[in-house]
């Protein structure tokens, strides 16, 4: 969960004489910065961003794939919180495992805080039987965090007569940045058409504090637990002969933040519909997530919208998320069956 920023409305508030809103706005911004340091960006389309959810999904698709994800959180406040993700992975027959690459860019408070996370992943696949296999993965990479003061606005910089922003910062501020290594581990397993796994991100709990004395810069270990299944119903009276229902559960914990997500997917031929409920156990708001997806042999598209169920709905207007997956090459028989049956989104 991220706290929203009012800084886009600051100019109008000062023109109306609401100087007190600045103190609240600046407090919210500082709290948001602390939250960013303590928690990773989140995506609602968990399985449309599988390597982000769990690195052990690397190389578990039938074909090499490239996935692009975009999330605009709380769009009514402008493009205040935006996250972009790119991942590429493939199965390698010679190693009986998968290799992958992931690059994530997260922009907070319209560019005041920026984070880039890049990593390489290797996943080893183990074929236990015709009905059961599992994967274990190690992810190594870096995190780059930047603090950009050019996005900050203070009341002394705003002309209360015409709202023009000018002047200098009333307190000394310096831009800063930090680059540190990062490591994660994950494992997934599949038995028939049920799947489950766990992931541990930020094993070393890296210190992202940009300034000396900042005690809130430590990035806590993130635990992810997930499970799901697919059931098939064959019929002759709808679009295709096969209708799929897939219930899923995802639990995540990072520091004091705890969240549980439960949802179900309905798939009919090229169409996928999904509905999830998100419950933030340690903080609010909760939300309802509606999803729509299209799928063909070489392309998948997903769109989702988070409906906030809390008092912040009037200010945030939910969150938009888009995913696109591209598959490459031709299918070749593998050394063993290790394609995951996870949902499209």
Question: What function would you assign to each model-found segment?
Answer:
Residues 1-42, 264, 292, 326-332, ...:
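Bacterial Sec-dependent N-terminal signal peptides
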Residues 39-345:
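Subset of outer-membrane beta-barrel
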């Amino acid at each position: 969960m991220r706290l929203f920023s009012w800084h886009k409305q600051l100019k109008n508030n000062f023109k109306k004489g609401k100087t007190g809103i600045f103190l609240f706005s600046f407090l919210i911004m500082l709290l948001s910065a602390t939250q960013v340091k303590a928690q990773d960006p989140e995506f609602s389309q968990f399985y449309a961003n599988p390597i982000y959810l769990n690195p052990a999904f690397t190389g578990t698709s039938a074909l090499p794939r490239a996935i692009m994800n975009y999330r605009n959180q709380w769009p009514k406040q402008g493009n205040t919180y935006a996250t972009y993700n790119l991942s590429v992975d493939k199965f390698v027959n010679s190693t009986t495992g998968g290799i992958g690459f992931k690059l994530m860019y997260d922009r907070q408070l319209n560019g005041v805080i920026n984070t880039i996370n890049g990593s390489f992943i290797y996943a080893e696949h183990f074929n236990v039987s015709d009905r059961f296999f599992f994967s274990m993965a190690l992810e190594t990479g870096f995190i780059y965090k930047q603090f950009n003061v050019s996005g900050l606005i203070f009341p002394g910089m705003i002309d209360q007569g015409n709202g023009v922003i000018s002047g200098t910062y009333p307190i000394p501020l310096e831009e800063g940045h930090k680059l540190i290594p990062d490591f994660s581990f994950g494992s997934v397993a599949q038995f028939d058409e049920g799947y489950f796994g766990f992931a541990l991100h930020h094993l070393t709990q890296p210190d992202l504090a940009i300034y000396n004395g900042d005690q809130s810069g430590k990035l806590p270990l993130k635990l992810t637990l997930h499970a799901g299944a697919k059931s098939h119903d064959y019929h002759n009276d709808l679009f295709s002969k096969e209708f799929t229902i897939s219930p899923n559960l995802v639990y995540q914990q990072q520091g004091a933040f705890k969240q549980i997500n439960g949802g179900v997917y309905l798939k009919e031929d090229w169409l996928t519909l999904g509905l999830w409920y998100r419950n933030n156990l340690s903080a609010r708001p909760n939300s309802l997530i509606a999803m729509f997806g299209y799928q063909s042999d070489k392309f998948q598209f997903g769109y989702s919208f988070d409906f906030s169920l809390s008092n912040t709905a009037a200010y945030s207007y939910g969150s938009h998320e888009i995913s696109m997956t591209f598959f490459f090459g031709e299918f070749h028989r593998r050394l063993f069956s290790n394609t995951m049956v996870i949902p499209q989104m």
